[in-house]
Structures are given as structure tokens and as C-alpha cells.
Amino acid sequence: MVTTSENCVRRDTCVQNGKGEVHMKDLTDKAGLYGHGRLFTHIVVDPGCSVGYHYHHPETEFYYILKGEGLFNDNGKEVIVHEGDVCVTGFGEGHSMENQSQEPLEMIALIVME
């Protein structure tokens, strides 16, 4: 199966009460994850914008940083993340991501079910 870029659902939205809007491109729908996940999305966080702090139940979310730099809040511990880093937020844990740089932050988000 191939999903072309033209067939991806795109949306600009405030995510989890974060700052500003985040640009999202769903790489597949929930059905495409065959019951094992609910999100597989390319995300662009513009400078000054963020994904607000939130928790995951009963699921785990992965962020793979494609480009840029972000401030990742990992259960209250803030860590600067860069291209190539992977952030994991497990069941019952909380996180957020903020772009404090002058360049867009690009990442892939994948949520898998426990």
C-alpha cells in the first residue's frame, strides 16, 4: 500500500492547548494502523508554538525529530531535543513539545496502543 502526499489529511490546529497552531499531516488513518495505534503523523511546530502538556492512557507516543530543535517536557523534566532524537512517553506519563528556536521543528509522531 502507498499513501501519496496528496492523499494525506492535513490540518492546522491547536494541540492540547499549546501555543499557536501546529501543522499536521496524517500519514495513515487509524484503520491503517490495524488496531495497534491511533496516530502516525508528520508534525511541523513553528517558532514560538507548542504541543501542550498532556498524558497518555493506555498508549505510548513516540516523537522522532526530523529537523530543528525543541524543548521536550518529559514528566516535568525539560530536555532540549535535536534532529535524530527519539522521545518516548509511556502509559500514564505526560509530555509537551515547544519550539523556542527561530526555525521550524519537524517530527514524526506515532501513538501505539498498550
Segments and roles (model prediction):
Residues 42-46, 55-72:
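Short, conserved beta-strand element in jelly-roll/cupin
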Residues 1-37, 52:
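A short, N-terminal "cap"/entry segment at the start of jelly-roll beta-barrel domains
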Residues 53, 72-73, 89, 95-102:
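Short beta-strand His + acidic residue motifs that chelate non-heme Fe in jelly-roll/DSBH
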Residues 76-91:
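Short acidic-glycine-tyrosine-enriched beta hairpin
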Residues 26-30, 41-56, 91:
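Conserved short histidine dyad/triad with adjacent acidic residue
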Residues 47-49, 58, 77, 93, ...:
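A generic "binding-loop/recognition-motif" signal
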Residues 43, 88, 103-114:
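A short hydrophobic beta-strand segment most commonly corresponding to one strand
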Residues 33-36, 46-49, 69, 113-114:
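Short, charged/polar surface micro-motifs in flexible loops or helix N-caps
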